């Protein structure tokens, strides 16, 4: 049995492992860390967890073990990726209509390139603790017209 409903490649599978063809694949946002649903730090004000971290968290942190799969939450185009001292290994995907998603602190980035088209559920990297991080997790940020907004406006916990 699967831990939660999730995307695998372009198929939506229920927690029982059954494919659900009724889910409109191109029109929904999906959970970025299949099988892991614990949010260790939510969007919004928070105490600084470590030096260099913000007291206003501009995303959500999903607890998962080092190496767990990170997937795109929606179809789009890889806008940028690489390493940043704060974000660690990161990928930024443009989804159109001013929406972009950013995935941070990954142990490594999957075989992607700038301009590459991705679908919801495409593997883009693997959970890690690079950059300013206190342990293995995925930080997911959502930008609307260049400003961070709550990821809960787009995704829901499976």
What are these regions (language model features)?
Residues 12-14, 107-108, 143-158:
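Short peripheral tails and domain-boundary helices/loops at the edges of structured domains
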Residues 55-58, 72-108, 136-144:
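Zn2+-dependent peptidoglycan hydrolase active-site motif and core
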Residues 76-79, 114-131:
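Active-site-proximal beta-strands of protease catalytic cores
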Residues 1-2, 93:
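SH3/SH3-like beta-barrel fold
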Residues 64, 109-112:
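Short alpha-helix capping/helix-loop boundary micro-motifs
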Residues 6, 84-86, 124-132:
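Short, charged beta-turn/beta-strand-edge "cap" motif at the junction between a beta-strand
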Residues 42, 81-82, 106-109, 127-130, ...:
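Residue-level recognition of beta-strand microenvironments
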Residues 7-89, 120:
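Surface-exposed, glycine-biased beta-strand/turn segments
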């Amino acid at each position: 049995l699967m831990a939660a409903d999730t995307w695998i490649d372009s198929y939506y599978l229920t927690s029982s492992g059954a494919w659900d063809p009724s889910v409109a694949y191109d029109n929904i946002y999906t959970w970025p860390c299949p099988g892991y649903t614990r949010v260790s730090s939510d969007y919004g004000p928070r105490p600084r967890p470590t030096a260099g971290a913000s007291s206003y968290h501009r995303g959500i942190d999903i607890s998962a073990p080092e190496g767990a799969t990170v997937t795109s939450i929606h179809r789009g185009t890889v806008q940028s990726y690489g390493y940043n001292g704060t974000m660690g290994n990161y990928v930024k995907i443009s989804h159109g209509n001013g929406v972009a998603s950013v995935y941070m602190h990954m142990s490594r980035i999957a075989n992607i390139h700038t301009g590459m088209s991705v679908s919801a559920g495409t593997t883009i990297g693997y959970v890690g603790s690079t950059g300013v991080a206190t342990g293995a997790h995925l930080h997911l940020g959502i930008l609307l017209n260049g400003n961070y907004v709550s990821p809960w406006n787009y995704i829901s916990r499976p």
